[in-house]
Amino acid sequence: LINSIKKQDYPQDLITIFVVADNCTDNTAQIAREKGAICYEHHNPDERTKGFALKYLFEQIQRDYGITSFEGYFIFDSDNLLKKDYISRMNDSFDAGEKIITSYRATKNFSENWIASTYALHWLRSIRTRHRARSFLHLATNIQGTGFLFASEIVKDGWKYTSLTEDRALTADCVVEGYEISYNDEAIFYDEQPVSLKVALRQRLRWSKGHLQAFAESGWGLFKNIFIDTHTQRYDDDKWYNYTWRTIRHRFMSFDTFAQLLPKNIINIFRWIIVYLILYPFFCSQFGLDNIRILYNSTWLAHGITHIFGDITVSLPAGAETYVL
């Protein structure tokens, strides 16, 4: 990663490389320093997420340099590689006024096995259906862990996102504050994907937990913004229709991000319990059933069973004694 940064076509005297060696027991810190990076070592077994490492890093930057002494910050994972013009492309968006920008995530090990390939397709789907579409409409896309740039003003008070998915928390908080998260399709970096099913499942579980944490932290703020927008800035020379368009866009960005974080599966589980295990048995005990189909062709399994055996129906007379849950 450090070598690929040093090979950028962007002026090297304008780049400062910080590395946080998070609970490392190898010679990561030594190698980083030998390569010319400023390395901070973080040792705390109770703080093992990436968010805590970044929190510690920005605390050290604030102490030694001042966070706002730099215009912006890139976030990368240690296994990332950058295309030669990556920083220049991202800087073009930054100079155009964008405050937080994500980029094109390519896969280093696409052909290693089927797990890496499916991850690569997952990120490609995200690029095609999430980043490009939202960026075209000037809405907020979402940060995905690595390969993004943000203005120092966003973390002027330090890094506060320490949940399991700090990227989702950052996304939600920035949208709440009225920032448009843009996407640069020409800035390409390469990321290594998991090749172990165990690692992939553990990562997915971490993502699921992190999404719930991000919703708990920022869900209410996003929901309020849908109806009461207090963060869209109004300029002195603003035409009324320009401000109206920006506030409508911010409300829709809040709704979009809220919908992405909303734990729909958990809500569906509670709905299933209330409707099918409580209300429906009560209805049946009071009014009975008359030739009600058990299976509907909503799944391939149900379709196959009904194709072989035909419609399976049930009839029950009314009365609590004839219908027992």
Task: List each language-model region with its residue ranges.
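Short aromatic/hydrophobic "clamp" motif used to bind/position activated sugar donors
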Residues: 73
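Short, acidic, metal-binding catalytic loop of nucleotide-sugar glycosyltransferases
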Residues: 3-14
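Long helical/loop segments within the catalytic core of UDP-sugar-dependent glycosyltransferases
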Residues: 41-66, 70, 84-163, 175, ...
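Acidic donor-binding loop at a coil-to-helix junction in glycosyltransferase catalytic cores
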Residues: 164-170
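A conserved acidic beta->alpha catalytic loop
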Residues: 21-29, 44-46, 81
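Membrane-embedded multi-pass helical conduit in multi-pass membrane proteins
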Residues: 260-325
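The conserved acidic donor/metal-binding loop of glycosyltransferases
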Residues: 77-81, 174
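Catalytic donor-sugar/metal-binding loop of nucleotide-sugar-dependent glycosyltransferases
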Residues: 138, 171-190
